[in-house]
């Protein structure tokens, strides 16, 4: 998968890895700038986001695009597939300008918010065995006094956290049933 402006617009193309293969244009007549594309583990889907703050799922065989979610404040930039390829984890900003983690299940088309937007959570990554979802969160308030600005600051607020998954690695617990 790659992006090109061959048509005059920035579009997503797929190119099979073999001699003589011709590129196949997936998105058409899109005026929105697109962010990085991620392949599913089984190479059946690609996800990408764009400047309209939308996260898209593309079926590689049919070229069908499905809107996963749309943010209201900032672009969706953090997204990843689960090892089995059925789940997409991503972070999305909330009206309070904090971000929460979400899961989208490809087989059902359902999405679930899995962290609240009290803190800023992002950069989700599934463990290789599918048993954990790791993410970064700004929730450690190491209040200290700034020696330069005569004010308080929060230093080293970001930490790595993990959410345990069920043994089969396909469902999140206790958030998704």
List the model feature ranges, each with a label.
Residues 81, 87-99:
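Loop/turn-rich, solvent-exposed surfaces of beta-rich toroidal or solenoidal domains
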Residues 53-54:
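Loop/turn residues immediately N-terminal
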Residues 1, 43-46, 85-88, 133:
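Hydrophobic beta-strand positions that form the internal "hydrophobic ladder"
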Residues 4, 13-35, 58-77, 92-94, ...:
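Multi-bladed beta-propeller domains
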């Amino acid at each position: 998968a790659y992006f090109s402006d061959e048509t005059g617009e920035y579009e997503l193309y797929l190119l099979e890895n073999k001699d003589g293969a011709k590129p196949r244009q997936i998105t058409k007549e899109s005026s929105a700038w697109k962010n990085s594309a991620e392949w599913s583990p089984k190479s059946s889907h690609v996800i990408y986001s764009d400047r309209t703050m939308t996260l898209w799922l593309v079926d590689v065989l049919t070229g069908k695009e499905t809107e996963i979610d749309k943010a209201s404040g900032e672009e969706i930039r953090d997204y990843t597939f689960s090892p089995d390829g059925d789940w997409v984890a991503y972070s999305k900003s909330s009206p309070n300008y904090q971000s929460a983690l979400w899961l989208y299940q490809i087989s059902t088309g359902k999405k679930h918010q899995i962290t609240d937007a009290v803190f800023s959570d992002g950069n989700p990554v599934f463990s290789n065995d599918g048993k954990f979802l790791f993410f970064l969160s700004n929730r450690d308030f190491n209040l200290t006094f700034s020696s330069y600005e005569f004010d308080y600051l929060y230093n080293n607020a970001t930490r790595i956290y993990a959410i345990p998954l069920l043994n089969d690695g396909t469902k999140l617990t206790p958030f998704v049933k």
